[in-house]
């Protein structure tokens, strides 16, 4: 009989725990978020002020404050925030202490196209507007920049981004109407003619070899132009 009562007591305690857990979970889901915390990932300067994110949330404030956690559409909030032209991704989630957390990844510019109007090209190769909050110190692009050749420019920018030497020293790109590319570097007054992107890796190798040799011989200031268009050679014009 005692064994039977202990068995009944064990079942009762288990059911009580399940009930209390379900009751607590139900009450928690029935609550609205206690706080909203906005976090910008990384240490980069902000292209979008936190107040701009607040404005987007204010547009949804009544929804956020009135809707309980169990029906809060986090994906819809993510979509609203991610739609901002300076934001690449946004992750919205509920924290264990009852708050709403927003993690934001900003778009990252690779270069600034100097035109009217000027704009950035981001790491995805997409046009990105300038920011009123911060002006990025990035490589400048001049010349005939169009929707049809922005992919060519992006490929050149990524080649620079992925090369330790060019990432430090390259300052300007120029593209003409025939999509021929030229480049300028930080400590050289001469123009570097790259041409098209055929054999680009080899052209970069050739230029770095030329640069090191000319620098060693103190000849960098003597050149007006360096042409990388020719196969397996660098032509320097003084």
Where are the regions a protein language model picked out?
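Extracytoplasmic/luminal low-complexity segments enriched in Pro/Gly and acidic/polar residues
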Residues: 198-238
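N-terminal membrane-targeting segments
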Residues: 1-68
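Extracytoplasmic
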Residues: 33-35, 95-99, 115-116, 133-138, ...
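Extracytoplasmic segments of membrane-associated envelope/inner-membrane machinery
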Residues: 103-177
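Flexible glycine-/small-residue-rich
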Residues: 40-42, 104-108, 132, 143, ...
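Structured, soluble extracytoplasmic/luminal domains of envelope-associated proteins
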Residues: 77-126, 225-227
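Periplasmic/extracytosolic POTRA-like scaffold domains at the N-termini of outer-membrane
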Residues: 42-85, 132-154, 205, 212-216
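Short beta-strands and strand-coil junctions in structured, solvent-facing domains, enriched
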Residues: 88-89, 99, 109-111, 128, ...
């Amino acid at each position: 009989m005692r064994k039977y009562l202990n068995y009944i007591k064990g079942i009762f305690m288990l059911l009580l725990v399940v009930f209390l857990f379900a009751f607590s979970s139900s009450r928690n889901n029935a609550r609205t978020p206690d706080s909203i915390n906005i976090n910008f990932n990384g240490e980069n300067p902000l292209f979008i002020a936190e107040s701009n994110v607040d404005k987007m949330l204010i547009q949804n404030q009544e929804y956020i404050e009135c809707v309980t956690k169990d029906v809060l559409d986090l994906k819809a909030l993510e979509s609203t925030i991610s739609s901002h032209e300076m934001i690449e991704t946004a992750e919205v989630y509920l924290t264990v202490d009852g708050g709403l957390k927003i993690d934001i990844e900003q778009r990252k510019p690779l270069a600034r196209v100097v035109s009217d109007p000027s704009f950035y090209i981001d790491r995805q190769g997409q046009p990105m507007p300038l920011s009123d909050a911060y002006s990025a110190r990035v490589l400048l692009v001049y010349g005939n920049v169009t929707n049809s050749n922005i992919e060519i420019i992006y490929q050149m920018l990524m080649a620079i981004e992925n090369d330790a030497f060019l990432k430090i020293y390259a300052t300007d790109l120029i593209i003409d109407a025939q999509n021929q590319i030229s480049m300028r570097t930080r400590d050289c007054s001469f123009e570097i003619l790259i041409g098209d992107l055929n054999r680009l890796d080899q052209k970069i190798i050739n230029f770095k070899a030329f640069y090191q040799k000319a620098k060693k011989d103190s000849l960098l200031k003597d050149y007006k132009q360096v042409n990388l268009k020719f196969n397996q050679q660098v032509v320097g014009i003084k």
